[in-house]
A protein has these predicted regions:
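Short strand-connecting beta-turns/loops that link adjacent beta-strands
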Residues: 38-39, 148, 253-255, 385-387, ...
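Residue-level signal for inorganic ion chemistry
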Residues: 44, 79, 106, 188, ...
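Short acidic, glycine/proline-rich loop/turn micro-motifs
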Residues: 260-263, 337-341
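Terminal RNA-binding accessory module
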Residues: 340-417
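Glycine-centered loop/turn positions within well-structured domains
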Residues: 104, 149, 194, 228, ...
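Proteins enriched for Cys/Gly/acidic motifs involved in redox and nucleic-acid/cofactor modification
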Residues: 1-195, 209, 233, 269-286, ...
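Conserved SAM/AdoMet-binding glycine-rich loop
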Residues: 74-75, 83, 180-306
Length: 417
């Protein structure tokens, strides 16, 4: 009998890449992947724990799966599974929970369970290589896992473990396999992507130089990189005519030096501003595309007064001027230094500040679009057919629509914005 399996992925693109890899491996073993809402014999839930809401969502989904599929096997992994393993094991219907360093055991454990065999508990690799597949244009390639930074608000280092990676020599074949599927764009992903090399004595700069040589891949994006790890040497090389696109996702978290210090971040606003300016100077030419900056910001960190928040607002509006702001209201996470502070910010204040930054983001994004009008760009068109239209993204991440043409799927075309 063919076993049906449903996959549920919560959280980041790294989780998405890992789930896609579990799916590929299980399909090779004869499983049939089905939408989880349709019911299945087995479920694999890949959880997130970045906020308290993420934890709650994970619990609710697990309970719903068991309620609707009381005979199904339910396996759980992901960041929430690492931090609260006993809590998840106590949920009715859960078959087994896998922590951050146990991901290589998941597929063998599922196979053993459905076949009635004994699970192999010998030591498994702590790094689980992964990349997403199934899309015809873009793949997320995991190059790094874990984080050695201990920012005062974050549980991810505890959920994902220490920074680790496999060698470049093992990553290149994965990129080549992605290219063999006809995929043109790879997004490099990790927990602290720029910290690549801790396990192997290599560097992220060495990695991207080798990936740039992979035939068949035309475009690369870096999903997120800490500002202190994005070096001028790296920027000089990226802007020298490589396959790496003018699209930078950089976590700022606060535009106030007081808050940055209390968060335990590794830079100040002056250093951040210099990095942004350097990238613009090295990338932008008159009449050419503008650089896309996506900036992460946390609002309502303990001790953030209205005046300190306005420092962030002003820094974003007048200095960084990103194309997009990823806004996160601070979430109190047990076990972190910030959670113990007495000067917590009220939720209603966080909501107001989120709205202010969302309004600013809308303005800045529109200005970014306007600044790129009339510019010649390359667009990688995707397969989605939406009311007779298809979409794609420029190198600097502007979404473009055109009449649907199946022959354009996965092709890079020149357009005038």
């Amino acid at each position: 009998m063919i076993m049906r399996i449903g996959f549920i992925t919560l959280g980041c693109k790294l989780n998405y890449a890992e789930t896609s890899t579990y799916e590929r491996k299980l399909l090779k073993e004869g499983f049939e992947a089905v939408p989880w809402s349709k019911g299945a014999d087995v479920f694999l839930v890949n959880t997130c724990t970045v906020t308290e809401h993420s934890d709650k969502k994970s619990r609710n989904i697990i309970r719903k799966l068991h309620r609707q599929n009381p005979e199904a096997l339910i396996f759980v992994t992901g960041c929430y599974a690492q931090l609260k393993k006993a809590e998840i094991e106590a949920i009715e219907g859960v078959t087994r929970v896998f922590g951050a360093t146990e991901k290589s055991r998941i597929v063998p454990a599922i196979l053993a369970e459905v076949r009635g065999e004994k699970t192999d508990e010998t030591k498994a690799p702590t790094f689980f290589p992964a990349y997403s597949s199934g899309e015809r244009t873009r793949s997320f390639l995991k190059v790094q896992d874990g984080c050695d930074y201990k920012c005062h608000y974050c549980t991810v280092p505890y959920a994902r473990g220490e920074s680790r990676n496999i060698p470049i020599s093992e990553i290149i074949p994965q990129a080549e396999a992605i290219a063999a599927e006809g995929i043109k764009e790879i997004v490099l992903t990790g927990v602290n992507t720029g910290d690549f090399g801790k396990s192997t004595g290599e560097t992220f700069y060495e990695l991207i130089r080798q990936l740039d040589k992979v035939e068949g891949i035309e475009r690369y994006r870096i999903s997120s990189i800490e500002p202190n790890l994005l070096t001028e040497e790296m920027i000089d090389w990226i802007t020298s005519g490589t396959k790496f696109l003018p699209h930078y996702h950089i976590p700022l978290q606060s535009g106030c030096d007081t808050i940055l210090k209390e968060m335990g971040r590794r830079y100040d606003t002056a250093a951040f501003a210099r990095k942004i300016q350097y990238i613009r100077e090295k990338t932008e030419v008159e009449g050419g595309p503008k650089v896309f900056f996506g900036i992460d910001v946390i609002v309502g960190f303990p001790g953030e007064t209205d005046e300190l928040f306005m420092e962030t607002y002003t820094f974003l509006r007048d200095v960084v001027r990103p194309a997009f702001i990823h806004i996160f209201p601070y979430s109190r996470r047990a076990g972190t230094p910030a959670a113990e502070r007495k000067d917590q910010v009220q939720d209603c204040v966080k909501t107001k500040r989120v709205q202010m930054l969302e309004d600013l983001c809308a303005t800045l994004h529109q200005e970014f679009i306007e600044a790129n009008k009339g510019v010649k760009e390359k667009v990688l068109f995707e397969s989605t057919d939406r009311k007779g239209m298809m979409e794609g993204y420029t190198g600097n991440y502007i979404r473009v629509s055109r009449k649907y043409d199946p022959e354009m799927i996965g092709t890079v075309a020149d357009i005038i914005l």
